[in-house]
Amino acid sequence: MGEQNKLYYDVEKLVNSLQESFDLDCAQSVSLFTSKSRSNEAWLEELENKFKLKDDVELDDVENLRAEIDMKLNMLEDKVSYYERLYKELEEFQNEIKIKTVVNNRRQSRTPK
């Protein structure tokens, strides 16, 4: 029975040693986590002071302005397309007039006077 008691005592001593080691590791981890959390909170506060966030009303105003600018840009693109097509049509018309003028001049030069 002495051997069994010694074995029981050694096992309990080992369990206590492991528990102490585990508790120490946990305490160090919690301490490190707390330290990093505080550091991150300080950094976040520094960033919040450095970069002010816009409130919802201001963000909505910016979004509305962006939508308005997009709409105006689309209208402008439509107008540019219209004027490009008009330019091509006028160019074609001008070429037709040139051809008709040449043909008419030839016709007039052939007719006896």
UniProtKB/Swiss-Prot annotation:
Record localization: Endosome
GO cellular component assignments: BLOC-1 complex; endosome
Q: Which UniProt keywords apply?
A: Coiled coil, Endosome, Transport
Primary location recorded for the protein, binned into one broad class = other
Q: Which residues form a coiled coil?
A: 57-97
Mention any additional remark. Present with 1240 molecules/cell in log phase SD medium.
Q: What protein does this entry describe?
A: Biogenesis of lysosome-related organelles complex 1 subunit BLI1
